[in-house]
């Protein structure tokens, strides 16, 4: 596993302080053994830890707690790969180079069969979380393939401990301390035009059930009753008919008073 140069000797408190000082990131606190924040209102930027002193103080006092990156307050976004094999199918279908994208940015590794790459968020664009799910061919249950993560969401950062493996999250790919690259234009296009690209990504699923053929419904022929009513209305003036049956017209208006 690739390791971040110069970070192996740092304590968690030192690393978190450096995230704030060097990267200008806003961090959220996560209890030990978890990937989810529990503090009330953790999604609000004002609740996040954003200074080196505050980060060092908190994680010195709570060294076993995990740490998360709050995207909305940090100017960051992430592409989260939950299924590498299926994501490769999508990328190939869209003409994208999966390996080149993974190598172009810092990558968080929690488990060997997954990946998460971080990018700088585009300015003046309000991106939100999006996800593609495919049915598992063995279970039939829907499973997330990949997520586009932005806004009031967080991602666990190294050196937090993964609750399932018991091992620390690590950095791979491009060095995080060199800064984050801009979100690649093709990924941004997919994100911004989600309603156009989502159906394409869903259709790329090799085992997607074929749509059930439903023959077009034949138009119903007009009924005899409808034809009789239309014929009567065409042959008779409505005003003359009402007056014949005793209705009294109100002046020159189209209103009539009942004879009863």
Model regions and ranges:
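Amphipathic alpha-helical segments
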Residues: 93-95, 233-245
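Short cysteine-rich clusters marking metal-coordination/redox-active sites
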Residues: 258-260
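ATP-binding catalytic core of ATPases
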Residues: 225, 232-233
């Amino acid at each position: 596993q690739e390791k971040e140069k110069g970070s192996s000797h740092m304590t968690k408190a030192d690393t978190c302080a450096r995230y704030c000082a060097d990267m200008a990131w806003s961090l959220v606190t996560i209890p030990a053994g978890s990937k989810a924040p529990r503090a009330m209102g953790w999604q609000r930027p004002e609740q996040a830890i954003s200074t080196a002193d505050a980060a060092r103080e908190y994680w010195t006092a709570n060294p076993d707690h995990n740490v998360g990156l709050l995207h909305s307050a940090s100017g960051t976004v992430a592409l989260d790969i939950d299924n590498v094999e299926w994501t490769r199918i999508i990328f190939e279908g869209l003409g994208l180079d999966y390996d080149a994208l993974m190598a172009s940015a810092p990558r968080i590794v929690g488990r060997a069969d997954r990946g998460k790459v971080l990018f700088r968020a585009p300015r003046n664009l309000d991106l939100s979380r999006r996800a593609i799910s495919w049915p598992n061919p063995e279970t039939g249950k829907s499973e997330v393939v990949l997520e586009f993560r932005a806004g009031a969401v967080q991602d666990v950062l190294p050196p937090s401990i993964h609750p399932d493996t018991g091992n620390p999250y690590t950095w791979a790919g491009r060095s995080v301390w060199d800064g984050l690259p801009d979100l690649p234009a093709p990924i941004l296009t997919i994100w911004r035009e989600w309603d156009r690209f989502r159906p394409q990504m869903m259709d790329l699923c090799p085992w997607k059930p074929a749509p059930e053929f439903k023959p077009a419904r034949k138009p119903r022929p007009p009924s005899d009753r409808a034809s009789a009513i239309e014929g009567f209305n065409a042959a008779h003036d409505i005003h003359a008919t009402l007056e014949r049956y005793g209705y009294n017209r109100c002046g020159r208006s189209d209103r009539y008073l009942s004879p009863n």
